Amino acid sequence: MTAITITDAAHDYLADLLSKQNTPGIGIRVFITQPGTQYAETCIAYCKPGEEKPEDTALGLKSFTAYIDAFSEAFLDDAVVDYATDRMGGQLTIKAPNAKVPNVNADSPVNERINYYLQTEINPGLASHGGQVSLIDVVDDGIAVLKFGGGCQGCGQADVTLREGIERTLLERIPELKGVRDVTDHTQKENAYY
């Protein structure tokens, strides 16, 4: 079950918007684009009957159904959708404190734990050089496939950073991980730090 909260004020505002769509059974779909990254954006969209996905979690509310995207669900933990009135009318707000970095524990999937450590421990250090690293995949043999960007792409020290910094940190924190692999095209050097 998802831990997203839709306040009464937000519910009433959304119910009013949905009633104006003249589509019986229309609801909303809540999702995050690029979850677990610094570029994460929380979104709410209309969801006509049949547009929901089988893996979505259906949250039955008083006047409509909110469909929570399965892939985004962990990142929507503790999220609050609210509506506040002001002199200009009002504003719908979505606060999702885990959109960029979800809460993780030892039972969380490996990819979520990798993203957590990339965002909280590794990327803040790389940001001082204008760089970042992102998880592309975890292959079956326990290898994290990573890609550098920004000042790290093409940097002469990227392999040292990968082995002595990133790999060491991830292996210490995630015992079932066996190693890391870089798939960055380091021939592109125009933004490289070194």
From Swiss-Prot:
Entry keyword set: 4Fe-4S, Iron, Iron-sulfur, Metal-binding
Pfam families, per database record: Fe-S_biosyn, NifU
UniProt GO molecular function: 4 iron, 4 sulfur cluster binding; iron ion binding
Cofactor note: Binds 1 [4Fe-4S] cluster per subunit. The cluster is presumably bound at the interface of two monomers.
Highest taxon of the lineage: Bacteria
Residues that, per the record, bind [4Fe-4S] cluster: 152, 155
InterPro entries from the UniProt entry: Fe/S_biogenesis_protein_NfuA, FeS_biogenesis, FSCA_dom_sf, HesB-like_dom_sf, NIF_FeS_clus_asmbl_NifU_C
Cofactor: [4Fe-4S] cluster
GO BP annotation list: iron-sulfur cluster assembly; protein maturation
Reported function: Involved in iron-sulfur cluster biogenesis. Binds a 4Fe-4S cluster, can transfer this cluster to apoproteins, and thereby intervenes in the maturation of Fe/S proteins. Could also act as a scaffold/chaperone for damaged Fe/S proteins.
Family: Belongs to the NfuA family.
The protein's assembly and partners: Homodimer.
Designated name of the protein: Fe/S biogenesis protein NfuA
Organism of origin: Pseudomonas fluorescens (strain SBW25)
Name of the encoding gene: nfuA
